[in-house]
Amino acid sequence: MCRFLISTPFSRRRGERKAEAGRMARSVSYVSAAKLLAMARSNPRVAIIDVRDEERSYQAHIGGSHHFSSRSFAARLPELARATGDKDTVVFHCALSKVRGPSCAKMFSDYLSETKEESGTKNIMVLERGFNGWELSGQPVCRCTDAPCKGTCSPEEPEL
């Protein structure tokens, strides 16, 4: 395995490096559909955030997910921080998790850092391949119209 180290200039004082490390403490990582399903089933402190826009209204969604449209996402950051305050992990996704999902995850991470939000959120993740990949890999989906989805879609689609 190759590892790359990023060095910091010697002129930086130790305190400056520590402060920078604190600002970068919340990073965004990716999680596979299978791993997310296992996490969500075993840990009630996982929140799934769907940032698709109108697609959610005519496509299925991940059971129990919360909808925060990417179009109004920035304005709803305080609401999202409150809604996920008791969660260890928050996982974002859009259709493919190439633009909206990662962008919203980064925006949320930055918001928590900038506002010093005392939230329980420790891990901010993005679902690999997004909702389309989730569905294509055979993971359970929900077609309810509840807002927010309660995750009780049908007997063969267990609550997450």
Curated annotation (Swiss-Prot):
Residue ranges of the Rhodanese domain? 42-143
Q: What is the effect of changing C94S?
A: Loss of phosphatase activity. Decreases arsenate reductase catalytic efficiency 14-fold
Top EC class per UniProt?
A: oxidoreductase
- Keywords attached to this entry: Oxidoreductase
Keyword Oxidoreductase on entry: yes
What the record says about the induction of its expression is: By arsenate.
Q: Which GO terms describe its molecular function?
A: arsenate reductase (glutaredoxin) activity; phosphatase activity; protein tyrosine phosphatase activity
Cross-referenced InterPro entries: Rhodanese-like_dom, Rhodanese-like_dom_sf
Reactions mediated catalytically:
[glutaredoxin]-dithiol + arsenate + glutathione + H(+) = glutathionyl-S-S-[glutaredoxin] + arsenite + H2O
Q: What is its EC number?
A: 1.20.4.1
Q: What's in the GO CC field? A: cytoplasm; nucleus
Catalytic residues as annotated in Swiss-Prot or TrEMBL: C94
Claim: Chloroplast is one of the keywords in the record: no
Q: Which residues form a coiled coil?
A: none
Q: List the disulfide bonds.
A: none
Relate the protein's function as given in its record: Possesses arsenate reductase activity in vitro. Catalyzes the reduction of arsenate [As(V)] to arsenite [As(III)]. May play a role in arsenic retention in roots.
This protein is called what? Arsenate reductase 2.1
Task: Tell me which species this is from.
Answer: Oryza sativa subsp. japonica (Rice)
Q: What gene is it encoded by?
A: ACR2.1
